[in-house]
Regions:
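Secondary-structure end/capping motifs
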Residues: 269-346
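Structured segments of extracytoplasmic/periplasmic soluble domains
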Residues: 88-91, 97, 116, 120, ...
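N-terminal secretory signal peptides
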Residues: 1-14, 18-27
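Short, solvent-exposed loop/beta-turn-alpha elements that line the ligand-binding surface or hinge
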Residues: 96, 248-254, 321-330
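Short, glycine-/small- and polar/acidic-enriched structural segments
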Residues: 37-197, 205-206, 222-228, 244-245, ...
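Periplasmic-binding protein-like
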Residues: 75, 148-157, 240-268, 318-319, ...
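Pocket-lining segment of extracytoplasmic ligand-binding domains
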Residues: 130-131, 210-302
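Conserved C-terminal helix/tail region of periplasmic/extracytoplasmic solute-binding proteins
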Residues: 43-49, 339-365
Length: 365
């Protein structure tokens, strides 16, 4: 652990209002200004956060010289698996790499985040790789720099009478909170691996995340596919009545990334040093999450006040936050996941996956 003798600077500006910006389409107009510190924690709490010593995954020097580089980071503060992002802010990793980072809150889906990056309304964002590969295949001009972690997507069934394996799901109905979301895409891969057709051998039904457990109990669905924190909390609410039968740490995916860091291509072209600095800051923060999950949970709890920090820490421990591949290692993972998505009929059959991986993954280390 390297201890910074000075307290890390927090960003001077924390959120940017995007609503009403000229040239933004309707989905981008849903962006709202949210101040990271005043909204989620008093100034005193932020000062206390800054006191925690900093551990680093890399010993690289700051890539950005002179005045801090302003970076607009699209972040909605809902996914515990991207806890490294607020940790990078509140524990000073952005400041150590000479970055002045603002959080932009998106009111909608990952697609809006990608549109924001491609349209130069944001500089960077993080989300599930399974959600990004289809838009990237379709031509969204965003580059991937590093994975953030593995794990966080789970499949549950009733303990007493539900299916016990993915193969048992043939002819069953799986509940999801989004038909096009990462849980549906990932478990479509596992179904395909098990010799089932995810389009015809199972049915998918969409429910609000907080209704999935009730739908299972009413017999409307036979299994639940969801991501943390909702998946974890659903299992807790069930009080032992459901069991996890698979996750995105199953099989080959035990050593693969779940979430990734993406940047707009024009930023990589115009300021590669800023992209390197951002990537190294996030990788340092993921190391912090892996080594200090209780502290990372305390940071993230300011963004999800309805969930106890102890529960958030338990979720983080169940993920693989020490796994953050970059460069060729990330390119191999993208190729593997894209290959699986093609087999599950999510990626087009004629897409050249090697070209796709080479196009979207950049080397920053």
């Amino acid at each position: 652990m390297n201890v910074d003798p000075t307290r890390p600077r927090l960003s001077r500006r924390h959120m940017l209002a995007l609503a009403g910006v000229a040239g933004v389409g309707a989905p981008l107009g849903l962006m709202q200004a949210v101040r990271a510190l005043p909204l989620f924690a008093p100034v005193g709490a932020a000062d206390a956060l800054a006191e925690v010593p900093i551990c680093r995954a890399s010993d690289t020097v700051d890539e950005v010289k002179g005045a801090p580089r302003h970076v607009r980071f699209a972040y909605n503060g809902t996914g515990i698996c991207t806890a490294a992002v607020p940790v990078a802010l509140h524990r000073g990793y952005f400041a150590r790499h000479n970055l002045d980072v603002e959080f932009l809150q998106l009111a909608g889906s990952t697609d809006q985040m990608l549109q924001a990056l491609a349209a130069d309304k944001a500089d960077a964002g993080s989300s599930m790789l399974l959600n990004w590969l289809k838009p990237l295949e379709q031509g969204i001009d965003v580059k991937l720099t590093t994975g953030l972690h593995g794990g966080c997507t789970r499949l549950f069934a009733a303990k007493e009478s539900g299916p016990r394996t993915v193969t048992d799901l043939k002819g069953k109905t799986i509940g999801v909170s989004s038909i096009s979301g990462p849980p549906r895409n990932f478990f479509a891969i596992l179904l395909s691996d098990a010799g089932l057709d995810p389009q015809t051998d199972v049915q998918w039904r969409e429910f609000p995340a907080d209704i999935l457990l009730a739908a299972l109990q009413r017999g409307e669905i036979d299994a639940i596919a969801d991501s943390d924190p909702n998946a974890w909390l659903t299992e807790r609410r069930a009080n032992g009545a459901i069991v996890e039968i698979a996750s995105n740490l199953s099989g080959d995916y035990a050593d693969l990334s779940c979430c990734t860091l993406g940047v707009r291509s024009s930023l990589w072209a115009s300021d590669p040093n800023a992209v390197r600095a951002l990537t190294h800051a996030i990788r340092d923060a993921t190391h912090h999450v892996a080594e200090q999950p209780d502290d990372a949970a305390e940071v993230f709890s300011k963004y999800t006040p309805k969930v106890a920090a102890a529960d958030l820490a338990a979720m983080l421990r169940s993920h693989t936050h020490s796994h953050h591949p970059a460069g060729e290692a990330l390119r191999r993972e993208v190729l593997k996941i894209a290959t699986d998505l093609k087999r599950a009929s999510i990626i087009r059959p004629n897409t050249d996956l090697v070209k796709l991986a080479n196009r979207v993954v950049i080397d920053v280390t």
